[in-house]
């Protein structure tokens, strides 16, 4: 029976849908008018709507005409007419909500109407999806609708140059993945000039598969990093060998639910004996604890052929949800190196963070945000609290006919898989297509072996075979097809009964050498014929599958999240098609083992229940639901915790990025640098005079410190003579005199190098100083967060301590930026070469304003790392992506490894 809250929410949903339906009715009234327009007249509607919006008419008022235009254009280009429920979804998206629409309801087409409407402002629209394939596919297909209406479509994928990316972002509607959009945001905030920027403002984003991107992937931040300077660390191999001698429950404990480890007393003693140290937890040994913890995690929590595979001598992560190999991706904070050491392959060096942001805070930076998914209701509260997004459940175009069978539970995994194969064989024999979901590469290959032994032809989608993934999924609805997919592999590609005609037609057009972007007229002329051929080819097969019962979905294990289970089930029964689903479980499945071991153990130990008996006890199903609720609650709490800590960083990040952008856009820094001079000199004087009387102050040391900052032009004697002796010297007088002297020195510096040269030098030096200190600050904040949990032992709230200390560190960083910039501006060699008399490719140089060539020693050509690493969440929110590139304009400060410096500083303090 639904709760009172559920009933209230249902009433609220009905009211929202009723208001939206009135708008849909207005669109429908315009349909005949727009159908009567010629292609040219329909195209001209875009110019008319843009002009009306520019004159002050709101997008809400323009919505009926804009949606009617898109509906008509889609019919003429794709042969697809928006259903009323698709227009409802589009209205929900325009209003900044999440539209929950079941699988097969045509969410890709839904996004076209709100994207077009919001692009009328000229400020750009981003359509975000989960992988490069879907971004390109959707941009190509839906781009035909937008081009027909006179709008440009772009797509952002990995490997594009900055020039190409800039062009794609300049389009009216740009498709891409969450990681690519986020990385470009970070790269833009590492830029040294406006010419390096690629993105426009964050105006409006429509996030496809929004639950995957904003929920599953929210715990893993986006990170751009470069190789840290310093010696390669030998400790990974040392600790990999050491932990082989340690025993679980004796030397260390493992919490599989929380995925954490803890070292026990006997283990600590063994480590100390092995390393020849007296106390592992002394300050100078702190870094060793991280190596030890990572080595134990690599041994106990990360399993080969489940969490990762070893291919060509490299450890490659496996996506937990899709089962695909995430080529080039790496775990953070030394964990990947620990796994490499465990497997005996080459250990690649650590990296230092150059820029980072969580997806939560990246997407909260959009002026308006919306999303689509088939499964959002279970996370509605989190969407509202974190992103301010409401969830609107859109009714299906046709009532669902899928039958969801009760779970079948067996005592062990072997019997379970035998039953799965028997079921598949029976369905396959009558021509019913079957989609089987597994939770790991290992299990998909085990099932594949069993199917092969029974002579059942099948396709496998997992980490070792994903090149043809979308094509295989698109045809998984053909008669008798058996497809084994590691969880949600191929999500975003519709499984249509009999085969996906649209996908087949697109592939055929590619074979014919036709490209919708390069030659849209030729493409549109040939498309109807090719699509008709594809539809005819699948028509008979469609009828055959309908008679066999539709797509049968088999789950071989419950996922931690009910939402993922629902996504698997949702592959069947699209658009009112018949279908069926069932989950086969065992009491040894990971979910039961970790979260309800007592229930599982009691049944397994019961002699009255044979191994091959299928269990359908109500309390078993209840135990599974409780286990899933526990995991979902834990994951939600982790995401909330990540956000709380990142909110502290986000305020700092916004301040730094806003500052950098104003400098790039040409802010005159003269007054700011003068304040830098005042603050830097003032801080040094304050530090020298904060204790004791004037007679106690070490003025000789003060003058030496100032001489490292700027050329001091006033002597101690000058100051003392001015005040009448040392006994009458006041700190504020000393500070005033020295600040005045420093400002005079800066005026002399300007006279020496020239105003124009100094203004450009100020811009470069301040940017370089911000970049250098921000990178260092990111490390310091990470270091602070790693140990902040220990404050709870002292009865202190870790988050409050993190906020307080983080603020202090941020203020110290700003002081460091000021002092560093002042020192460089005084001491670096600044020169201005004559302006060039001509430019390559410019015939009339008189038409170009020629500026002098400014050179600032040490920062003219920022050093870039040979390889940048781009780390972000995979489709399961767990993994990290790595690829090389130096096109971002990022700078890396040279120097020793910061962990080594930190350790040295600790030793110094102890000494």
Curated annotation (Swiss-Prot):
Keyword presence, Translocase: yes
Main EC class the enzyme belongs to: translocase
Catalysed reaction equations from the record: ATP + H2O + cellular proteinSide 1 = ADP + phosphate + cellular proteinSide 2
Any one GO BP annotation for this protein: intracellular protein transmembrane transport
Chief localization: membrane
Protein keywords: ATP-binding, Cell membrane, Cytoplasm, Membrane, Nucleotide-binding, Protein transport, Translocase, Translocation, Transport
InterPro entries named among the record's database cross-references: Helicase_ATP-bd, P-loop_NTPase, SecA, SecA_CS, SecA_DEAD, SecA_motor_DEAD, SecA_preprotein_X-link_dom, SecA_SF2_C
Record text on subunit structure and interactions: Monomer and homodimer. Part of the essential Sec protein translocation apparatus which comprises SecA, SecYEG and auxiliary proteins SecDF. Other proteins may also be involved.
Protein name in UniProt: Protein translocase subunit SecA
Gene: secA
């Amino acid at each position: 029976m639904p709760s009172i809250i559920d009933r209230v929410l249902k009433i609220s949903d009905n009211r929202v849908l009723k208001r939206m339906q009135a708008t849909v009715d207005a669109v429908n009234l315009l349909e005949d008018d727009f159908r009567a327009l010629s292609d040219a007249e329909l195209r001209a509607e875009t110019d008319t709507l843009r002009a009306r919006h520019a004159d002050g008419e709101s997008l809400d008022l323009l919505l009926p005409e804009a949606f009617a235009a898109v509906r008509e254009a889609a019919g003429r280009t794709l042969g697809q007419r928006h259903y009323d429920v698709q227009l409802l979804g589009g209205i929900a998206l325009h209003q900044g909500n999440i539209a929950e629409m079941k699988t097969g309801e045509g969410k890709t087409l839904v996004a076209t109407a709100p994207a077009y409407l919001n692009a009328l402002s000229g400020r750009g629209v981003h359509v975000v999806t989960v992988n490069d394939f879907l971004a390109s596919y959707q941009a190509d297909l839906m781009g035909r609708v937008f081009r027909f209406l006179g709008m440009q479509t772009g797509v952002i994928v990995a490997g594009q140059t900055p020039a190409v990316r800039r062009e794609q972002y300049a389009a009216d509607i740009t498709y891409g993945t969450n990681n690519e959009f986020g990385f470009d945001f970070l790269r833009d905030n590492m830029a040294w000039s406006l010419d390096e920027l690629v993105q426009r403002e964050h105006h409006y984003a429509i996030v496809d598969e929004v639950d995957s991107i904003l929920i599953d992937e929210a715990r893993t931040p986006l990170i751009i990093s470069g190789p840290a300077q310093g010696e390669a660390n030998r400790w990974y191999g040392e600790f990999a060998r050491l932990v082989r001698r340690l025993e679980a429950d004796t030397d260390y404990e493992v919490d599989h639910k929380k995925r954490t480890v803890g070292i026990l007393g006997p283990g600590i003693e063994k480590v100390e004996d092995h390393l020849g140290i007296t106390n592992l937890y002394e300050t100078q040994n702190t870094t060793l604890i991280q190596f030890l913890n990572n080595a134990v995690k690599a041994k106990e929590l990360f399993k080969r052929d489940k969490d990762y595979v070893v291919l060509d001598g490299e450890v490659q992560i496996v996506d937990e949800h899709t089962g695909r190999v995430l080529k080039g991706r790496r775990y953070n904070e030394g964990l990947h190196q620990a796994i490499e050491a465990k497997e005996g392959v080459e250990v690649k060096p650590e990296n230092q963070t150059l820029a980072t942001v969580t997806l939560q805070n990246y997407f909260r930076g959009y002026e308006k945000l919306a999303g689509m998914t088939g499964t959002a209701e279970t996370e509605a509260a989190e969407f509202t609290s974190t992103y301010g997004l409401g969830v609107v459940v859109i009714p299906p175009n046709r009532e669902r006919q899928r039958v969801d069978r009760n779970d079948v539970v067996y005592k062990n995994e072997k019997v379970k898989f035998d039953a799965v194969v028997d079921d598949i064989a029976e369905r396959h024999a009558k021509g019913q297509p079957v989609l089987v979901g597994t939770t790991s590469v290992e299990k998909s290959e085990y099932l594949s072996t069993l199917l092969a032994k029974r002579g059942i032809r099948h396709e496998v989608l997992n980490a070792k075979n994903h090149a043809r993934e979308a094509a295989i999924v698109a045809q998984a609805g053909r008669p008798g097809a058996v497809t084994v997919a590691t969880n949600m592999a191929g999500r975003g590609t519709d499984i249509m009964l009999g085969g996906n005609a649209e996908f087949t037609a697109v592939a055929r057009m590619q074979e014919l050498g036709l490209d919708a972007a390069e030659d849209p007229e030729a493409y549109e002329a040939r498309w109807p014929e090719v699509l008709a051929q594809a539809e005819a080819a699948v028509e008979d097969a469609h009828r055959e599958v309908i008679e066999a019962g539709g797509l049968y979905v088999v789950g071989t294990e419950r996922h931690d999240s009910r939402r993922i289970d629902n996504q698997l089930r949702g592959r069947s029964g699209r658009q009112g098609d018949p279908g069926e689903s069932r989950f086969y479980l065992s009491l040894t499945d990971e979910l039961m083992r970790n979260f309800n071991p007592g229930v599982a153990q009691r049944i397994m130990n019961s002699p009255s229940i044979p191994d091959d008996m299928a269990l359908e006890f109500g309390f078993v199903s209840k135990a599974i639901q409780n286990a899933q609720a526990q995991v979902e609650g834990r994951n939600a709490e982790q995401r909330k915790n990540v956000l709380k800590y990142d909110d502290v960083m986000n305020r700092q990040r916004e301040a730094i990025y806003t500052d950098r952008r104003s400098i790039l856009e040409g802010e005159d820094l003269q007054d700011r640098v003068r304040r830098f001079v005042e603050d830097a000199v003032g801080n040094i004087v304050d530090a020298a005079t904060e204790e004791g009387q004037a007679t106690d102050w070490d003025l000789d040391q003060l003058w030496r410190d100032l001489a490292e900052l700027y050329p001091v032009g006033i002597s101690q004697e000058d100051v003392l003579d001015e005040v009448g002796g040392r006994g009458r010297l006041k700190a504020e007088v000393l500070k005033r005199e020295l600040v005045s002297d420093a400002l005079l020195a800066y005026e002399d510096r300007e006279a020496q190098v020239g105003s124009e040269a100094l203004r450009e030098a100020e811009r470069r030096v301040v940017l370089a100083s911000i970049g250098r200190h921000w990178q260092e600050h990111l490390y310091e904040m990470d270091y602070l967060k790693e140990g902040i949990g220990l404050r709870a032992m002292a009865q202190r709230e870790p988050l409050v301590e993190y906020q307080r200390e983080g603020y202090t560190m941020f203020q110290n960083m700003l002081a460091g930026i000021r002092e560093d910039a002042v020192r460089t501006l005084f001491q670096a060699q600044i020169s201005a070469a004559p302006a060039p008399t001509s430019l390559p490719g410019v015939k009339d140089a008189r038409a170009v304003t020629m500026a002098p060539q400014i050179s600032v020693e040490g920062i003219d050509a920022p050093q870039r790392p040979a390889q940048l690493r781009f780390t972000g969440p995979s489709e399961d929110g767990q993994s990290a992506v790595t690829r090389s590139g130096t096109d971002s304009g990022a700078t890396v400060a040279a120097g020793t490894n910061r962990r080594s410096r930190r350790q040295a500083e600790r030793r110094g303090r102890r000494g």
